[in-house]
Amino acid sequence: MSPKTLYDKVFEDHIVYEDESGSNLLYIDRHLVHEVTSPQAFEGLKNAGRTVRRTDCTLATVDHNIPTISRVNFKTLLTFIDQDDSRLQVQTLEQNVKDFDVTYFGMTDDRQGIVHVVGPEQGFTLPGTTVVCGDSHTSTHGAFGALAFGIGTSEVEHVLATQTTIQANPKNMRITIDGELSEGITSKDLVLHVIGVIGTAGGTGCVIEFAGKAIEDLSMEARMSICNMAIEAGARAGMIKPDEKTFEYIKGRPLAPKGDEWEKALKYWKTLHTDDGAKLHYDIKIAASDIVPTITWGNSPQDALPITASVPDPANVSDPIKKSGMERALKYQGLTPNTPFVVIKMHKAFIGSCTNSRIEDLRAAAKVAKGHKKADNVKLVLVVPGSGLIKKQAEKEGLDKIFESAGFTWREAGCSMCLGMNPDILDPEERCASTSNRNFEGRQGARSRTHLMSPAMAAAAAIKGHFTDIREFDYVDNDEPSITIEHEVEDKELQDAVYEHEKEIIEGTPGTEAERSTTSLKMNQNSKKPNQMLIKMVPITVLPFLTGITAPLYKANVDTDAIIPKQFLKTIKRTGLKNGLFYESRFVKMPMVRCQTDFVLNVEPYRQAEILLVTGDNFGCGSSREHAPWALKDFGIKSIIAPSFGDIFYNNSFKNFLLPIRIPQDVIESKLVPVVKAGHKLTIDLPNQQIKDGETGDVLIEKFDVEEFRKHCLVNGLDDIGLTLQKEEYIQEYEAKRREKFSFLEGGSKLIKPIKGTKKSIYGNKAQEW
């Protein structure tokens, strides 16, 4: 047997069917669901009369939209969530999980929290599994040796209906961090440094495996922070091989295998590593000694530099696109070139998000805050735990009192200020020291200015009133044991809090291999019949040829937040989003009026553009929001040509019959831009994979690349779910093999103990809070 990478092993163990073109039907072990990207998916199931195939493999919670203010007086969603659109999304999820019998942690459940915190905390995330969620930071779960990636809403519906997703096979990239990290250097510094080295498009088309002694020395929570931000390097996923730390973290958690199943799982998990001699497409080595406390300065995570550095100067950059991007970023951020980072003052700080809201992060921030007060110029410091259980554990350790004594604000679990879809936002031009994962324009509020850093650095900035090198920070004392616990036991007390829900044995809950297999089989049998009857495919959109006005966009790293800002995501429909397309670029908001800018899509003839020609790399980087292709399609755009795309955006585009075409930047500039500047339309011939001058018929691009399966679907207007359900026999065959080989995965979310007052069943608890 030829040597394989960690990724290869997990991927190959989940192939249900591989067609001649190389597209793979991949089985999904774990599906996490939240309120923002699921409404349209459940609506699709209802409209087609389909069910959720594997409710035991599905777990839902609310996180993005919910307020993080105290829930002491919580009565109902109606009175607690003020924003109508946010409330509607949460209410819609609660109705959907009830209708489809999906296990759900709502706002009165201690287990509620950010999906990427809840999954590992409950033991739902396991090594060697495939994990998906309608959220780009699903890569977090790769810290366990899982293949975890974000998907769009159409794929959420696909997974709900079929428990599979159609995937091409990405390339293998390994990033080895040699040596030991210096004192005071965290996983956040490490991953920001990596992104600064390879760029936000460096991992495009790849799964990154993080390796080396520096990675092995990290705790599981720190590893999660690393994999969480793999997506910011353009990767499809990030992975770290499981080891004894991984197994110790998982053992005994509510949804982890027990007894003989644990031993069986452990035997398999210990095979999950990259073999010597395995094929790597890219093998990058970084010295741990080169990594220092790191901070971002611009509007992309790749704009990362040491805290000891100064704001970069565009005058030193020759590339016109890069120079223009830097100038725009500095203007937006209100920064002057060559200003030392350590003198830049800030207004607010945010400690939280799926990157840095775990107990280890809170302990690190509390260690800094202890005995200090926030600076007078700092208006607000939000500390938001990743789950209700983490909140309870932090309060048990007295961390909340440390934060409150320092003038910080202690909140309930949720995504909070990470993306500003809820009431936690920055005012225009406020500068924030943030432990989140993205510093895009408007990410934390209109005209907000975000700087990414570690929890300790954010807390130190809040105390000092300006960005600070944590290595030079004066701690009040070294009384570490009261708020810091050694890595070997750091999770134990939190696990006790998690296990409080699991102390009583649930009579009738399947726990043995045989019982789990029986349970899973019953679930499958119950869910197959309705979906099997609905495999008829109805052509939706046919896109063989397109001749259209082509709008040029001279910009790189156009992220999904720029394509459609977060305020337009609070919808339960797929339509009506064209007014939100490039909103911050197309409109200037003046008092009582909204004025159009000279952005290309506001200018004739490009108001009628059907093709978008982008000259810079990495179009559509960032989040998994399918709202981006929905908005483009709603405007009338049918194809985007660019040097490269964010992987999730690329997939989402095909799901919506929007054709993304990759063409090298030099070819775009030499062959396509002159034609567009001359006012000619472009013609896209999909069957022959050519691009022509729409006026003369001259062939400009002899052959562009597109996967055969995706081309077939676009040309014929075929529905992915309908195509997949035609392969029902292969799915059933895989599920039978899974019940035998991976029996420790059976039962999943349905093994959760019912909370007091809920009805018991052989599947665990029903969906809660109705």
From Swiss-Prot:
Q: Which UniProt keywords apply?
A: 4Fe-4S, Amino-acid biosynthesis, Branched-chain amino acid biosynthesis, Iron, Iron-sulfur, Leucine biosynthesis, Lyase, Metal-binding
> Which superkingdom, per the lineage?
Eukaryota
Q: Tell me a Gene Ontology molecular-function term this record carries.
A: 3-isopropylmalate dehydratase activity
Cofactor remark from the record: Binds 1 [4Fe-4S] cluster per subunit.
Any single GO BP term: L-leucine biosynthetic process
Catalysed conversion reaction = (2R,3S)-3-isopropylmalate = (2S)-2-isopropylmalate
| PROSITE patterns linked to this entry | ACONITASE_1, ACONITASE_2
Residues binding [4Fe-4S] cluster: 354, 415, 418
Which top-level enzyme class is recorded in the Swiss-Prot or TrEMBL entry?
Answer: lyase
Q: Which InterPro entries match?
A: 3-IsopropMal_deHydase_lsu, 3-IsopropMal_deHydase_ssu, 3-IsopropMal_deHydtase_ssu/lsu, Acnase/IPM_dHydase_lsu_aba_1/3, Acoase/IPM_deHydtase_lsu_aba, Aconitase/3IPM_dehydase_swvl, Aconitase_4Fe-4S_BS, Aconitase_4Fe-4S_dom
- This protein's pathway: Amino-acid biosynthesis; L-leucine biosynthesis; L-leucine from 3-methyl-2-oxobutanoate: step 2/4
Functional note: Catalyzes the isomerization between 2-isopropylmalate and 3-isopropylmalate, via the formation of 2-isopropylmaleate.
Q: Which HAMAP family did the record assign?
A: LeuC_type1, LeuD_type1
What family does the Swiss-Prot or TrEMBL record give for this protein? Belongs to the aconitase/IPM isomerase family.
Describe its assembly: Monomer.
Which NCBIfam families does the record associate with it? leuC, leuD, PRK01641.1, PRK05478.1, PRK12466.1
Stated name of the protein: 3-isopropylmalate dehydratase
